[in-house]
């Protein structure tokens, strides 16, 4: 269930990045993603996914026609802060409380 929650948040992050790119006139069609990011990638993502080991928990959403030519044609996102937050929530839950 926790993975589903993370996956839904990742989907929201991806959709926001896609919208930003589309608002700037681009047509995002690829995701370059690290292996950690891919673990939480929803199956219904409509972009072609390429795994790049070095990206870790990050991903780059881009319009492949302009990637490397125009900086605004790509958006890098990271789920590392989200994963760290979930880890801290687990730690806090395990702390015994005094009653």
UniProtKB/Swiss-Prot annotation:
This is Putative type 4B encapsulin shell protein PF1875. InterPro entries: ENCP4, ENCP4_sf. It comes from the Archaea. May self-assemble into facets and potentially into larger complexes. Keywords: Encapsulin nanocompartment. One of its GO terms (cellular component) is encapsulin nanocompartment. Signal peptide: none annotated.
């Amino acid at each position: 269930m926790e993975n589903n929650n993370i996956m839904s948040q990742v989907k929201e992050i991806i959709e926001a990045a896609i919208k930003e790119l589309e608002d700037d006139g681009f047509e995002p069609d690829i995701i370059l993603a690290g292996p950690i990011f891919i673990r939480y990638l929803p199956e219904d993502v409509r972009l072609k996914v390429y795994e790049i080991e070095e990206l870790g928990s990050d991903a780059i959403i881009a319009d492949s026609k302009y990637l490397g030519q125009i900086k605004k044609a790509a958006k890098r996102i990271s789920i590392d802060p989200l994963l760290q937050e979930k880890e801290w929530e687990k730690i806090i839950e395990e702390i015994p409380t005094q009653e």
